From Swiss-Prot:
Topology class, membrane: Multi-pass membrane protein
CC terms in the record's Gene Ontology section: plasma membrane
SMART domains linked to this entry: 7TM_GPCR_Srsx
Name of the protein in its database record: QRFP-like peptide receptor
Positions of disulphide bridges: C120-C203
Gene giving rise to this polypeptide: QRFPR
Length: 380
């Protein structure tokens, strides 16, 4: 705290109390001094709304993305190159769901950081990995679709399952590399308000200099958001031109060809929706982060806390969007999701087995839970 051109320290406080012959409380009341440390806190109403939405997002994202991984893992027919990429997306969303959402919720509920220095470093590290791997995986999917539709003769060589695995390994290595600075610039710090005798523990992001912090933020925005989105936009425009303009359904009279084009169109629609949702959900977060770095939010601290909580909530909501999109726009995923859910809910109990039943409850349950294979030509 500054008094004129003088920094207000504990030593100066004791000297002022001695000179004025006052207690600390009398001194505070006499001069109307505010706390030296102010940690903004959400209002009770905002906390309640935040809690409800975070719980909904957590449960929906955990269930949906787990179903995606299990469906692809258990069904050989579903293990296509693109579905391998989709599993990578689900893994990114599960990281955010399991690590980032609970800790961020706790941070919004409490004034003090109670998770220690390790979690203070881990959470932003994991969040950066997940966001970077998501956008790079989406770009990989767009490239895979581009070659599958525009250059179908090259796709089997250029993007086999093995090569897809190598590409995804590189995606995750790059994402870890991009996120590594988070381990060094975040730390849990105790702040002592010696005037009001309060102690707060906060998780702070402290760089070596403002230039490094701004450069890192701009790098993430441009290289890991704007450029990938522009790349995907260009690729999907070319794909759309090929499928909707150069290959109109019904012109050739070939029924099989028409069905193939329709399936490709449906897959492209689904992927474009996934990309749009990612962009819409993460754009507010990137915008607020860059504004804060370049100009400052210029808001009262409580309002800034609320704004950051809102954009975090919107960003995390993307974690459950993708499984919903797959269930609505892809028939294979929809059938497999329903089978998995029925498997959990409708298991046959011993009381349901009649004397005429030839199968044991276990056999009936196993048969009822078997995932539908789906025809190969229905894959996305």
């Amino acid at each position: 705290m500054m008094l004129g051109n003088m920094t207000f320290t504990q030593t100066i406080l004791h000297e002022l109390l001695r000179q004025h012959n006052m207690t600390k409380n009398e001194f505070i009341e006499r001069f109307g001094l505010p706390p030296l440390v102010y940690v903004p806190e959400l209002s009770p109403g905002a906390k309640t709304v935040t809690l409800v939405f975070y719980v909904i997002i957590f449960l929906a994202a955990l269930l949906g993305n787990t179903l995606v991984v299990v469906v692809v893992w258990k069904n050989k027919v579903m293990r296509t190159t693109m579905n391998i990429f989709i599993c990578s997306l689900a893994a990114s969303d599960l990281l955010i769901t399991i690590v980032c959402i609970p800790v961020t919720l706790m941070q919004n509920m409490l004034q003090n950081w109670i998770m220690g220095d390790f979690m203070c470093k881990l959470v932003p590290f994991i969040q950066t990995i997940a966001v970077a791997s998501s956008i790079l995986t989406l770009t990989g999917i767009a490239i895979e679709r581009y070659y599958a539709i525009i250059h179908p003769l090259k796709v089997k060589y250029l993007l086999s399952k093995t090569r897809a695995g190598i590409i995804l390994a590189l995606v995750w290595v790059v994402s870890v590399g991009v996120a590594t600075p988070m381990l060094f610039v975040h730390k849990a710090e105790e702040i002592h308000d010696f005037l009001y005798e309060q102690r707060f523990v906060t998780c702070q992001e402290k760089w070596w200099g403002q230039t490094q912090q701004t450069s890192y933020t701009i790098f993430n925005l441009v290289v890991l958001f704007i450029i990938p989105l522009l790349t995907m936009t260009s690729l999907y425009i070319r794909i759309a031109h090929r499928l909707w303009v150069q290959q109109p359904v019904g012109v050739t009279g070939n029924f099989a060809h028409g069905n193939s084009v329709r399936r490709k169109r449906q897959a492209v629609k689904m992927l474009v929706v996934v990309v749009l949702l990612f962009a819409v959900c993460w754009l507010p977060y990137h915008t607020v982060t860059v504004m804060n770095e370049l100009t400052g939010l210029r808001l009262e601290e409580k309002s800034a806390k609320l704004l950051i909580a809102i954009v975090q909530l919107i960003a995390f909501s993307n974690s459950f969007n993708n499984p919903v999109v797959y269930a609505i726009l892809n028939e294979n995923f929809k059938k497999n999701f329903m089978t998995m859910l029925r498997c959990r809910v409708n298991r046959v109990s011993p009381q349901q087995v009649t004397p005429n039943t030839l199968q044991t409850p276990l056999e009936q349950s196993t048969r009822s839970c078997r995932l539908p294979a789906g025809a190969p030509n229905q894959q996305i």
